[in-house]
Design a protein with these regions (language model features):
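Metallocofactor- and cofactor-centric catalytic cores in central/energy metabolism, strongly enriched
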Residues: 1-109, 113-117, 122-207, 347-365
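Anaerobic metallocofactor- and corrinoid-dependent redox/one-carbon enzyme cores
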Residues: 21, 38-47, 61, 113, ...
Length: 366
């Protein structure tokens, strides 16, 4: 079995161990250990039936699974358990557990060789977005940096008649409504988007974190929000403020769900309802998050300090109602590890009079 696994290494994203009976723990652990695939493992075992426990019919898979899992633990091989310790292979739980396991495989294998773009540098005043490239690299995640000036230089060199640029202009207009007074700014936005995407493609980038203020607005003349929104909608997560850990978190969520993810701040209390929190960001939500037709505009806070004419490109929208999963990693340099938190809750339909992309959230009762 180990030889068969090794011969198909490039085709195997995970291993499912199914025990119809007690099984052969030594054979199972040797096959997985010697193959050395380092992929996720799911262990499933079948039910016994109370009227079929004679010597010829009993399974003993309940006990066999405990032994197999104990061996996996002894060998330091991570494994995933099923919803119930044992159940029939004809149970609907099996399909659900396999679907969940497939998501685990996508996350593990996707992050193991992920390449995260870092365009520019983080805001000087936001040390919360600092992350350790070395700790990420230890988990197989490579950070690929580029100076923002290189992207802006590439954007400026794009000719107005360039076919790729014209396609991007059309794509943006189909993606969101553009106020007439900002039509002349749209070409700047499109050139920036093309330059970012071309750099990402050339460097095989899976997710990206962008210096979205304030050099871009001051030295080029637009915001980065719609570019990030459109990338995230294409399942290429884009995080603000060169938040590398945020980009990794978004990528993990996208791999798990197969859907766009977004970067939000836990930003405001919701009156005196302590089970709710207002989440927001300037204007980067992917289109599928938003309940209304998207409209492009200027940044709120930065529009006041930098001038609205320099901050066009923000996405305006309110997140549509539904459930959501939240996840965040951070690198702990002092302890030499990557930490994370994970939870779920609800996106409510509560009105909230704040500019930008808004999501009023409520914690899950579970």
């Amino acid at each position: 079995s180990a030889k068969l696994f090794r011969e198909n290494r490039d085709r195997i994203d995970g291993i499912i161990v199914s025990l119809p009976n007690f099984g052969f723990e030594i054979g199972i652990i040797n096959a997985i250990s010697v193959a050395d695939l380092n992929v996720p493992v799911l262990v499933q075992a079948c039910d016994d039936e109370n009227d079929k426990v004679d010597l010829d019919s009993r399974r003993d898979a309940f006990c066999g699974k405990i032994s197999v899992c104990n061996n996996l633990y002894q060998y330091g091989i991570p494994f995933t358990d099923t919803t119930l310790h044992t159940y029939s292979i004809y149970s609907d739980l099996l399909a659900a557990d396999i679907n969940k396991f497939a998501a685990i495989c996508r996350v593990v294998n996707g992050l193991r060789h992920a390449r995260i773009g870092a365009i520019g540098t983080r805001p000087a005043g936001f040390q919360t977005v600092r992350a350790s490239e070395k700790l990420l690299q230890a988990s197989g995640i490579t950070v690929v940096p580029v100076d923002l000036s290189e992207i802006l230089s590439a954007a400026r060199k794009i000719e107005d008649a360039d076919e790729t640029l014209q396609a991007k202009l059309k794509e943006i207009r189909q993606y969101a409504a553009v106020p007439e007074q900002y039509n002349d700014k749209l070409i700047l936005q499109a050139k920036f988007g093309v330059a970012v995407e071309q750099w990402m493609e050339a460097n095989e980038i899976d997710a990206v974190a962008i210096q979205c203020w304030d050099s871009l607005e001051q030295n080029y003349g637009c915001a980065a929000c719609v570019t990030m929104s459109m990338l995230s909608e294409k399942l290429i997560p884009a995080a603000c403020e060169v938040d590398i850990a945020g980009a990794v978190s978004m990528y993990a969520l996208t791999l798990a769900s197969g859907r766009p993810s977004a970067l939000l701040d836990w930003n405001n209390n919701f009156a005196e309802d302590r089970d709710k929190c207002v989440c927001t960001h300037c204007g980067n939500f992917p289109k599928s998050f938003v309940m209304n037709d998207l409209k492009l505009g200027t940044l709120g806070v930065l529009g006041r300090t930098l001038g609205k004419v320099h901050t066009f490109g923000a996405v305006y929208g309110k997140v549509k109602q539904g459930d959501f999963t939240f996840f965040r990693i951070s690198t702990d340099d002092t302890k030499g590890c990557i930490k994370s938190y994970l939870g779920k809750g609800d996106l409510t339909d509560d009105p909230y009079g704040m500019d930008g992309c808004i999501a009023v959230t409520k914690r899950s009762e579970e």
